[in-house]
Amino acid sequence: MKKLFGISLITVITLFFTFSNYSIVLAGDSPHFVGVKTCGMCHKKDAKGNQLKVWKGSKHAKAYKTLQTAEADKIAKDKGFKTKAVETPECLSCHTVASNVDASLKGKKFKIEDGVQCEACHGAGSKYKKKSIMKDHAKAVAAGLTDFKDKATIQKKCETCHNKKSPSYKKFDFKKMWKEIAHNIPKK
Ligand code: HEC
Ligand code: HEC
Ligand code: HEC
Ligand code: HEC
């Protein structure tokens, strides 16, 4: 009996260390949000479609500022919120990226004020932002880049925000809306 107890105690201790190690690895392994400044460093060449410039000229870049207006505060109030629009989690959830994510998952250059920036659609970038990974689609996707394999996948992503939960919802015409923000790399 004594011997048996000794063995099971060792088993328990072994299991504990095995699993506690796993959870440490998992928690430290999630990609974090690096912010548009980081993506923009490499994606601002005109010959490659200057994604940074296209985004800066889009309403997505102003989505946070929109929440700082009197119009936004009125919308929030009419919906029964007691806080200013820019302090209301529901509004922030569509007008920014990672508003409800732990600070440890946001890099130094990440700014909530940047509104609906690159990682809103492409996914948190700390693990795929390296040039060698970015150039290899499969590696980038494995490192967290959203895989936009067809139009339906893209439209689904848009509709996570462009839907009836938006207080100012306008019917979402995907073709027209994508044209307004398209930032493809020009084909040679
Ligand atoms: C160190 C430079 C660098 C950084 C930083 C970087 N990229 Fe890239 N990215 C590239 C290169 C190089 C390519 C390959 C295409 C090309 O030559 O422009 C690429 C390709 C892409 C593609 C197309 C990949 C595919 O397989 O479909 C997307 C989308 C993209 N980047 C988004 C981002 C986002 C979002 C960020 C920020 C989180 C980012 N990139 C940060 C250099 C970079
Ligand atoms: C994270 C949420 C989010 C996602 C995902 C998103 N959008 Fe938006 N989009 C917004 C918000 C918020 C606004 C309004 C910004 C403002 O006016 O301040 C907006 C505005 C726009 C506008 C300007 C509309 C106008 O009235 O002028 C276009 C075009 C647009 N989005 C296209 C797209 C497309 C296409 C996709 C998918 C590829 C997409 N969006 C994905 C949140 C999102
Ligand atoms: C489900 C996502 C979502 C939520 C939640 C959301 N918005 Fe928006 N917001 C959008 C999108 C997308 C647009 C672009 C217009 C549309 O809905 O088609 C937008 C546009 C706006 C505009 C610009 C008005 C216009 O006509 O273009 C204001 C102001 C605004 N939102 C305020 C708010 C406030 C305040 C809240 C919180 C009470 C809020 N939004 C919550 C997605 C959202
Ligand atoms: C509203 C969503 C959204 C935002 C914001 C956004 N993108 Fe994209 N991006 C897409 C989608 C969807 C595609 C895929 C288009 C396709 O396959 O036709 C794409 C494609 C790309 C590509 C590859 C283009 C190609 O032709 O292969 C690059 C590079 C890229 N985005 C970089 C960026 C960068 C950098 C930012 C921020 C400055 C950004 N994107 C912001 C949705 C977005």
Locate predicted features.
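Functional cores that coordinate and move charged inorganic groups
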Residues: A120, K165-S166
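Bacterial N-terminal signal peptides
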Residues: S8-N21
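Sequence context of c-type cytochrome heme-c attachment sites
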Residues: Y22-E113, E119, G125-A152, F172-K188
